[in-house]
């Protein structure tokens, strides 16, 4: 092998190796989760409430919190709405929301769906969704809409705490098909706002559902008792994600190798022509 041949081979090998390395660096080490707060909450307040939970799962997941576009109706008719209290949609004619309400409207839902779709697109990539109370109801609806390809959001897993099926008539079609993505459903035995039977009904719509039932009420639990469940769930999701990325990387690397060989052939031909001319 001449020095020129060796140089050409080294250049091609280096370029292919660099392409493979670039693909490998693009694989993240955490799954990313978009989080939806409950009624009368907002993204920042929800983030603060989940401080302990985030510490448990921080090694495996990154959580991004957004705020609903609608200000919730004031608790008292004569009072002014509180800007920090937000709502994803209203299901009562007076513009308020109640999880147990059946057959009502869904005022503002489409605007909120566009808000989440925009966050999914611009703040992503994301792999999962997490929601609490109204936010968990929303996550369930998004999963159903994604199954029917009626939203641009494509969650690979979801966490639903104190969730429930929406009673709004326009949402009924979202529950027509069973959903197969992995989900973790969290609810309290003494929840008086969203009774556990409502959360169980939501969980029943998912084929691959894991349930974490706690002894408390309407809140997102994050004690030592729940820690291992959270860790195991996100460990599994991260492993699935990395395995999927590795398969994609292998396919892309093969494609890059093929392209590199073609480029090498062209370079070899060019250098050979130059050598012939110098002879």
UniProtKB/Swiss-Prot annotation:
Spans annotated as Disordered: 249-279
Residues the record marks as active site: 133, 191, 218
Cellular component, GO annotation: cytoplasm; nucleus
Keyword list, A-Z: Hydrolase
Its EC number(s): 3.1.2.-
Keyword flag Magnesium: no
Lyase as UniProt keyword: no
Entry protein name: Esterase CG5412
Species whose genome carries this gene: Drosophila melanogaster (Fruit fly)
